[in-house]
C-alpha cells in the first residue's frame, strides 16, 4: 500500500515476473502459498459467497468483512492473544477488509503473451529493438507463421534460417500429420517458435550494448554519405537515421533503469484487487459487474483450455493448439487495450468492454480525474469575464458560488453572533437569503483569499490567490492584467475556484500566491502582467479621439466630416469647442452627456512656459473687448493680458486622454507612497488619500 508520507513520487514502468509474484503471492500461517487465480468464477449462486480460487476469493484477496472469515468465524483485529490468525477450515486470514483494495492476484499463463502496448502503440518498442517490420512481428505474435529455431551442434529437422511461413501449404498440412500433440509440442519447442514465446526468446537474446554500438556505427556511415540527389532516397536515409537514434536511446534507457526487454512478454498476468473491479447486487437475481471481470473470466477460460490441451490431451490437432494460443493472446489484448488489434471484444448486448487503457487514459481516466484533477470539496467552477474596475489582487465571485463555498463559515458566524440557535436555523436563514447573511459573507470574504486555477496548469502562475468580491450574475470577474499568467482570455474560458481551509494554506496564499506578488515570469523574468488584447483595444479607443491638431480638424475640408460629434450639424469652431478649468469639470460634462469621449476640448493646464517654442507663430489670434486676446496654436492656446502677460494656458485634448492621464498619475502616486511607507516604521506610515 502506498504511504503518502514515505512515497513522494510515482513511476510507471515494466516489472519482472518475480516482482508480480511478490505482489500477488502470500504465505498463510500454515505454510500454504496462495495468490494464483485458477477459476473463472466470482460468487456462488446459492450462498452468494466468493468462490475459492476465483476472481473474488477471500483466501487470495482477504476477507469481505473485517475480522470475519468465509465460515463466519470472528476474530478481533490486532489482538495478538487471539490464536490462530487465520481460519483453519477456509484459510481466510483475520485482517482488515481494506486489504482487498491493494492485495493482488495473478494468472499463470500457459503460453507467453505479448504486451500489446509495446507492440502496437507508437512508437513500437518491440520494432525498435528487434529492427523488424511491424506486420512481420504481428504475424509472429498472432501465430501467422513459424520462426525456425537454429540449435548449435545438433541436427535439426528444419534446415532453414530466418522465417518459415506457416501459410505455406506443405508445412501447414504435413507437419501435424507426423506428430501427436505431445510429440508436436516437443518438436516445436526444439526447432520451431511462434506466438509470444518467439518474441520473448528474441528479446532475451538481445545484447543492448551491442545494439548501441552497431547502431552508432551504422548512423555514422549514413551521416558520412553524400546526398544522392534523389529526394525519395534521401528521405529514406533520413528516416533510417532517426530510427537508429530512437533505437540507441531506447537501449540506453533499458540499461539505465535495469529493465530487461523480455519483460515486455507476460508469463504471469496480474489480477487487480477486487475493490477496483467491484460487483454490485441490485436485486436478488441481478448483478452489476465491471467489464474487467468479464475479460478476466475469458482469459481464465481460454488459459485453462490451453493448459488442458497441452497437458492432458494426446491426439489434439496442432491447429487447435495454435488457435487457442491466438485466442489467449487476443483475450489479454482486450484486457490491456480493447480494440487496438481490430475488432473489439463485446458482450451479449454488443456493447464494447472497457479495458484497462480506457480506465486509465483520457480526461475521465483514473490518472487525470482521480490523481491529477481530483474533485475536491470547497471548490467551484464558472466562466470568466472581464472586471475592469477590480484591483489586481481581487476577483469577482458570484453570490451563488460564494454562499456555497463559505456556507460553513457563515453558519459558524451566525451561531457565534447569536443570530441562529443551531445549524438548522442557520441553514434556513441562508436558504431565505436574508440581508444579514450577505453582510456576514462579505465580512468573511474581506479576510479570506481564494485560489483561482485554469487548466492546464503548466507553470506556477496557473493557480493564483485573490481576495473575492461579491458580484451579481454567475460569471467570475477577473482583472485583465492577470490573464497572461493563466493563458486565459474572455471567449468562454472556465476557471476553478478553491477555498484554502488550513492556516498554512491561507498563509501560503497570502505570502506567495497573490496575483500582485507574481508580476514577473518565473522562467525569464519578463513582466507577466502586461496589457494585452482587450486592454490594448480599450487604450486605443480611449485615446483615438479628435486630437490631430486644429489645422487638420478645422482647415482641411476633406477631414472635416470625420471629426464631427453625434450631431450631424456640429462643426468644430472655437465657440463649439468648450473650455474647462480642470479635469473634474470635463468629467462632469461627460456624465451630463454634453461632450463625447473623443470630442476635442480646451483644458486649463499648468504648462511650463519653457516648452513653448518662442519661434512658433500662432495660427489665429482672437481679441476680446477688454483687451485680452487668445493666441491659438496647433495643440495649445495662450490667454494674454493687455500687457502681453500670460494669464492662462489651455491644451487641446480629449476626455479619453484626460482619463488615461489621471489613471497614470494615481498609479505613480500610489507607487511612490508605497515606497515611502516601506522605508518608515510601521507606527508612522502614511495612509493613501
UniProtKB/Swiss-Prot annotation:
<feature type="binding site">
    <location>
        <position position="491"/>
    </location>
    <ligand>
        <name>Mg(2+)</name>
    </ligand>
</feature>
<keyword id="KW-0808">Transferase</keyword>
<dbReference type="InterPro" id="IPR042102">
    <property type="entry name" value="RNA_pol_Rpb1_3_sf"/>
</dbReference>
<feature type="binding site">
    <location>
        <position position="489"/>
    </location>
    <ligand>
        <name>Mg(2+)</name>
    </ligand>
</feature>
<feature type="binding site">
    <location>
        <position position="69"/>
    </location>
    <ligand>
        <name>Zn(2+)</name>
    </ligand>
</feature>
<keyword id="KW-0548">Nucleotidyltransferase</keyword>
<dbReference type="InterPro" id="IPR000722">
    <property type="entry name" value="RNA_pol_asu"/>
</dbReference>
<dbReference type="Pfam" id="PF00623">
    <property type="entry name" value="RNA_pol_Rpb1_2"/>
</dbReference>
<dbReference type="GO" id="GO:0000428">
    <property type="term" value="C:DNA-directed RNA polymerase complex"/>
</dbReference>
<dbReference type="InterPro" id="IPR045867">
    <property type="entry name" value="DNA-dir_RpoC_beta_prime"/>
</dbReference>
<dbReference type="InterPro" id="IPR007080">
    <property type="entry name" value="RNA_pol_Rpb1_1"/>
</dbReference>
<dbReference type="GO" id="GO:0003677">
    <property type="term" value="F:DNA binding"/>
</dbReference>
<dbReference type="GO" id="GO:0000287">
    <property type="term" value="F:magnesium ion binding"/>
</dbReference>
<comment type="similarity">
    <text>Belongs to the RNA polymerase beta' chain family. RpoC1 subfamily.</text>
</comment>
<dbReference type="GO" id="GO:0006351">
    <property type="term" value="P:DNA-templated transcription"/>
</dbReference>
<dbReference type="GO" id="GO:0009507">
    <property type="term" value="C:chloroplast"/>
</dbReference>
<feature type="binding site">
    <location>
        <position position="90"/>
    </location>
    <ligand>
        <name>Zn(2+)</name>
    </ligand>
</feature>
<dbReference type="GO" id="GO:0005739">
    <property type="term" value="C:mitochondrion"/>
</dbReference>
<keyword id="KW-0934">Plastid</keyword>
<keyword id="KW-0460">Magnesium</keyword>
<keyword id="KW-0479">Metal-binding</keyword>
<comment type="function">
    <text>DNA-dependent RNA polymerase catalyzes the transcription of DNA into RNA using the four ribonucleoside triphosphates as substrates.</text>
</comment>
<feature type="binding site">
    <location>
        <position position="87"/>
    </location>
    <ligand>
        <name>Zn(2+)</name>
    </ligand>
</feature>
<keyword id="KW-0150">Chloroplast</keyword>
<dbReference type="InterPro" id="IPR006592">
    <property type="entry name" value="RNA_pol_N"/>
</dbReference>
<keyword id="KW-0862">Zinc</keyword>
<dbReference type="InterPro" id="IPR034678">
    <property type="entry name" value="RNApol_RpoC1"/>
</dbReference>
<feature type="binding site">
    <location>
        <position position="71"/>
    </location>
    <ligand>
        <name>Zn(2+)</name>
    </ligand>
</feature>
<dbReference type="InterPro" id="IPR044893">
    <property type="entry name" value="RNA_pol_Rpb1_clamp_domain"/>
</dbReference>
<dbReference type="GO" id="GO:0008270">
    <property type="term" value="F:zinc ion binding"/>
</dbReference>
<feature type="binding site">
    <location>
        <position position="493"/>
    </location>
    <ligand>
        <name>Mg(2+)</name>
    </ligand>
</feature>
<keyword id="KW-0240">DNA-directed RNA polymerase</keyword>
<keyword id="KW-0804">Transcription</keyword>
<dbReference type="Pfam" id="PF04997">
    <property type="entry name" value="RNA_pol_Rpb1_1"/>
</dbReference>
<comment type="subunit">
    <text>In plastids the minimal PEP RNA polymerase catalytic core is composed of four subunits: alpha, beta, beta', and beta''. When a (nuclear-encoded) sigma factor is associated with the core the holoenzyme is formed, which can initiate transcription.</text>
</comment>
<dbReference type="GO" id="GO:0003899">
    <property type="term" value="F:DNA-directed RNA polymerase activity"/>
</dbReference>
<protein>
    <recommendedName>
        <fullName>DNA-directed RNA polymerase subunit beta'</fullName>
        <ecNumber>2.7.7.6</ecNumber>
    </recommendedName>
</protein>
Amino acid at each position: 500500500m502506498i504511504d503518502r508520507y514515505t512515497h513522494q513520487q510515482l513511476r510507471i514502468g515494466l516489472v519482472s515476473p518475480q516482482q508480480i509474484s511478490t505482489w500477488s503471492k502470500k504465505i498463510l500461517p500454515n505454510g500454504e502459498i496462495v495468490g494464483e487465480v485458477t477459476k473463472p468464477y466470482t460468487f456462488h449462486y446459492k450462498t452468494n459467497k466468493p468462490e475459492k480460487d476465483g476472481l473474488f476469493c477471500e483466501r487470495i484477496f482477504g476477507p469481505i468483512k473485517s475480522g470475519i472469515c468465509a465460515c463466519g468465524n470472528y476474530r478481533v483485529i490486532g489482538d495478538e492473544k487471539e490464536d490462530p490468525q487465520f481460519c483453519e477450515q477456509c484459510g481466510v486470514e483475520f485482517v482488515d477488509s481494506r486489504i482487498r483494495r491493494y492485495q493482488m492476484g495473478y494468472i499463470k499463463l500457459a503460453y507467453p503473451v505479448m504486451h500489446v502496448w509495446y507492440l502496437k502503440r507508437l512508437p513500437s518498442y518491440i520494432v525498435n529493438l528487434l529492427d523488424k517490420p511491424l506486420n512481420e512481428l504481428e504475424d509472429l505474435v498472432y501465430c501467422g507463421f513459424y520462426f525456425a529455431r537454429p540449435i548449435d551442434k545438433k541436427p535439426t529437422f528444419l534446415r532453414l534460417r530466418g522465417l518459415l511461413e506457416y501459410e505455406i501449404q506443405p508445412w501447414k498440412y504435413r507437419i501435424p500429420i507426423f506428430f501427436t500433440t505431445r510429440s508436436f509440442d516437443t518438436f516445436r519447442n526444439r526447432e520451431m517458435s511462434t506466438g509470444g514465446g518467439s518474441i520473448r526468446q528474441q528479446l532475451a537474446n538481445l545484447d543492448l550494448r551491442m545494439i548501441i554500438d552497431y547502431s552508432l556505427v551504422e548512423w555514422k556511415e549514413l551521416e558520412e554519405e553524400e546526398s544522392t540527389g534523389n529526394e525519395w532516397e534521401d528521405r529514406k536515409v533520413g528516416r533510417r537515421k532517426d530510427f537508429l537514434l530512437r533505437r540507441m536511446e531506447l537501449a540506453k534507457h533499458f540499461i539505465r533503469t535495469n529493465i530487461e526487454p523480455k519483460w515486455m512478454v507476460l508469463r504471469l498476468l496480474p489480477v487487480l484487487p477486487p475493490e477496483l473491479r467491484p460487483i454490485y447486487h441490485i436485486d436478488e437475481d441481478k448483478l452489476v459487474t465491471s467489464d474487467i471481470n468479464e475479460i478476466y473470466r475469458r482469459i481464465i477460460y481460454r488459459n485453462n483450455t490451453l493448459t488442458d490441451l497441452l497437458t492432458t490431451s494426446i491426439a489434439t490437432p496442432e491447429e487447435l493448439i495454435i488457435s487457442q494460443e491466438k485466442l489467449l493472446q487476443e483475450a489479454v489484448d482486450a484486457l490491456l487495450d480493447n480494440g487496438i488489434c481490430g475488432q473489439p471484444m463485446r458482450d451479449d448486448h454488443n456493447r464494447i468492454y472497457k479495458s484497462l487503457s480506457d480506465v486509465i487514459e483520457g480526461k475521465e481516466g483514473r490518472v487525470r480525474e482521480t490523481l491529477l484533477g481530483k474533485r475536491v470539496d470547497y471548490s467551484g467552477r464558472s466562466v470568466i469575464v472581464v472586471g475592469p474596475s477590480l484591483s489586481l489582487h481581487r476577483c469577482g465571485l458570484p453570490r451563488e458560488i460564494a454562499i456555497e463555498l463559505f456556507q460553513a463559515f457563515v453558519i459558524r458566524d451566525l451561531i457565534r453572533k447569536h443570530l441562529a440557535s443551531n445549524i438548522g436555523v442557520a441553514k434556513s436563514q441562508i436558504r431565505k437569503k436574508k440581508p444579514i447573511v450577505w453582510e456576514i459573507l462579505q465580512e468573511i470574504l474581506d479576510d479570506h483569499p481564494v485560489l483561482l486555477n485554469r487548466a492546464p496548469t503548466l507553470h506556477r502562475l496557473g493557480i493564483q490567490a485573490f481576495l473575492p468580491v461579491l458580484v451579481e450574475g454567475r460569471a467570475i470577474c477577473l482583472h485583465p492584467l492577470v490573464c497572461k499568467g493563466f493563458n486565459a482570455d474572455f471567449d468562454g474560458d472556465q476557471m476553478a475556484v478553491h477555498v484554502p481551509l488550513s492556516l498554512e494554506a491561507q498563509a501560503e496564499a497570502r505570502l506567495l500566491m497573490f496575483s500582485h506578488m507574481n508580476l514577473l515570469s518565473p522562467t525569464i523574468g519578463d513582466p507577466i502582467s502586461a496589457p494585452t488584447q482587450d486592454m490594448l483595444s480599450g487604450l486605443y479607443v480611449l485615446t483615438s479621439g479628435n486630437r490631430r491638431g486644429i489645422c487638420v480638424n478645422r482647415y482641411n475640408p476633406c477631414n472635416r466630416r470625420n471629426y464631427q460629434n453625434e450631431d450631424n450639424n456640429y462643426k468644430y469652431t472655437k465657440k463649439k469647442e468648450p473650455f474647462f478649468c480642470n479635469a473634474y469639470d470635463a468629467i462632469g460634462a461627460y456624465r451630463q452627456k454634453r461632450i463625447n469621449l473623443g470630442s476635442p476640448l480646451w483644458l486649463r493646464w499648468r504648462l511650463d512656459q519653457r516648452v513653448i517654442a518662442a519661434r512658433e507663430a500662432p495660427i489665429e489670434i482672437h481679441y476680446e473687448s477688454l483687451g485680452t486676446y487668445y493666441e491659438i496654436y496647433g495643440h495649445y492656446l495662450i490667454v494674454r493680458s493687455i500687457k502681453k502677460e500670460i494669464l492662462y494656458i489651455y491644451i487641446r485634448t480629449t476626455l479619453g486622454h484626460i482619463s488615461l492621464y489621471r489613471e497614470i498619475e494615481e498609479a505613480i502616486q500610489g507607487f511612490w507612497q508605497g515606497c515611502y511607507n516601506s522605508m518608515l516604521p510601521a507606527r508612522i506610515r502614511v495612509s493613501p488619500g
